[in-house]
Design a protein with these regions (language model features):
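Acidic, glycine-rich segments characteristic of secretory precursors and extracytoplasmic regions
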Residues: 2-4, 8, 20-67, 113, ...
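Conserved, well-structured interaction surfaces
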Residues: 40-59, 80-151, 173-178, 187-200, ...
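Long, intrinsically disordered, low-complexity segments
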Residues: 20, 41-42, 52, 60, ...
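Flexible, polar/acidic helix-loop-strand segments at domain edges
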Residues: 79, 85-88, 317-372
Length: 489
């Protein structure tokens, strides 16, 4: 569904005039009012598809900028990749492209349009209408969840912007308020609306996708018992193929092909009852298909991490040193995750062969947002915080067994912090290159102790990204994050 003319104008005025100009030059714009666009089941489907398209545009580069490049997993790659190096080296200014939130707020506005208009659309099956609405609520929650983790307090819009008014110029809303009063309530609404008997997509939000976001959000809210209970719910959803819809993959070779083959070159598919993935590890991912999105919508997984591309980052020496620790020697994930290639430790998790298989070269590698092992280790952390060390370590053992490693026992730890750090190290290795490590450091407030020796990150406020100067020029009610001052460049 094309963005309506006054929607684009209003959002651009509020958020980024420069981006608006580029957007208008690249895309034809419909003159049809939003209320006239949301009339049929086909309109609803197109409108929801647009949300996923905007999520893909938002995360195409920012998946790495926001979740990976500020962490101890990576070091700068090719000298020509200066944008990435500034983020990695903690030298960001207010004109970084990853500091822009324009596309993210376009996504939020599209979810708001869906939430407003989908309930009034007549459909043959009410369950389909509810499912579209549930996806919209879940995607709005996910968008704001990214926003508060990246910038902290952000402007809050829960109604669609359909015409220009002064109301589009908003101050920033407290991040904890957004988490408590928007993100978690939206996810609870999505939980009640998603069609559990038909929606078996992993490229879209299923009920397990809702629960994955919800569990993650509960961990940020330090609601460990609720996170634990939410992850348990995933075991109740059956697959039409038999067994569970999401589950742990116990074989390391199959774990490897999940990244090199399962995430590659899946066709466009709008049939929610068709689960085209063999791996049940995958819960929700951002899909890339050149036929669907064109050459401007390809994945950066290959270009930014391959020595045959413009390698933006390499795996850091600090990350590699983990495999030298006594209880990590012989980790079967190492050779599947990293390879020394062209004078750098290269992230090879998503690539097969010496350079790449043919599918990688088409740049159609999907980005995993959530998978089941992520949830297991998150649940282990939640249980450790509840004093259930044995149960937490049982979950860790399942993951480490697959990697060919032994696991410490409850008696090997003297404190909850030691158990949590053990789990966080496991998350770091298991989820390398999946946009999770930086957010783990933020959530657990370990970013100072981990990153200060690497890039000097230690001042309060440095953990947030700057707000792009253009947003502040356009909206004087927005105040820059304190670490970056109130400069406009």
């Amino acid at each position: 569904m094309k963005n309506i003319k006054y929607f684009v104008g209003a959002v651009c005025l509020a958020l980024s005039l420069n981006s608006c100009s580029d957007f208008l030059n690249e895309e034809p714009v419909s003159e049809i009012p939003a209320g006239d666009m949301w009339q049929t089941a086909r309109d609803a489907k197109a409108g929801i598809n647009e949300i996923y398209g905007l999520l893909r545009s938002t995360l195409r580069e920012n998946y790495f900028y926001w979740g990976e490049f500020r962490s101890d997993n990576v070091a700068p790659g090719a000298p020509v990749m200066a944008d990435q190096a500034r983020v990695i080296n903690n030298l960001m200014s207010t004109d970084e492209k990853c500091a822009k939130w324009t596309t993210l707020y376009q996504m939020i506005n599209q979810t708001n349009l869906a939430i407003k208009y989908v309930p009034n659309i007549s459909m043959p099956d009410v369950a389909d209408r509810n499912d579209y609405l549930g996806q919209a609520y879940a995607l709005r929650a996910l968008a704001y969840f990214y926003a508060i983790r990246v910038w902290g307090d952000v402007p809050l819009f829960i109604e669609p912007t359909e015409k220009y008014s002064e109301a589009i110029y908003k101050e920033r809303t407290d991040k904890n308020y957004i988490l408590e009063h928007v993100i978690l309530p939206d996810l609870k609404k999505a939980e009640s609306l998603i069609n559990r008997n038909k929606n078996y997509e992993r490229k879209r939000i299923s009920i397990c996708g809702v629960w994955a976001i919800m569990a993650d959000a509960y961990m940020w809210a330090e609601e460990y018992n609720l996170a634990d209970q939410t992850i348990d719910k995933m075991a109740t959803i059956a697959s039409k193929k038999g067994g569970r819809f999401v589950d742990f993959e116990p074989n390391i070779a199959t774990w490897h092909t999940m990244f090199t083959e399962e995430l590659n070159n899946k066709p466009s598919d709008d049939t929610p009852e068709n689960d085209e993935y063999n791996s049940r590890e995958l819960i929700f991912l951002v899909h890339f298909n050149m036929d669907e999105v064109g050459t401007n919508g390809y994945s950066y997984m290959y270009q930014w991490f391959s020595g045959s591309g413009n390698r933006a980052a390499v795996i850091s020496d600090k990350f590699m040193s983990i495999f030298d620790e006594k209880d990590m020697k012989g980790d079967l994930r190492k050779d599947y995750t990293v390879k020394n290639y062209q004078n750098g430790n290269e992230l090879r998790k998503y690539m097969a062969g010496d350079i790449s298989n043919s599918l990688n070269k088409t740049c159609e590698v999907a980005y995993p947002i959530y998978r089941y092992t992520d949830m297991m280790l998150l649940q282990a952390e939640a249980r450790a915080h509840q004093g259930k060390w044995g149960e937490a370590l049982d979950l860790v053992k399942t993951v480490r067994d697959r990697a060919g490693l032994n696991t410490l026992t409850e008696n090997d730890f003297a404190s909850e912090e030691e158990v949590v750090n053990y789990i966080l190290r496991e998350r770091q290795v298991e989820l390398a290159g999946e946009g999770r490590r930086w957010f783990d450091l933020l959530r657990t407030e370990k970013w100072k102790e981990v990153m200060k020796p690497i890039n000097g990150m230690e001042q309060d406020g440095n953990e947030l990204f700057p707000i792009h100067y253009s947003h502040i020029l356009e909206n004087p009610k927005i105040v820059q994050n304190t670490y970056y001052g109130n400069t406009n460049n």
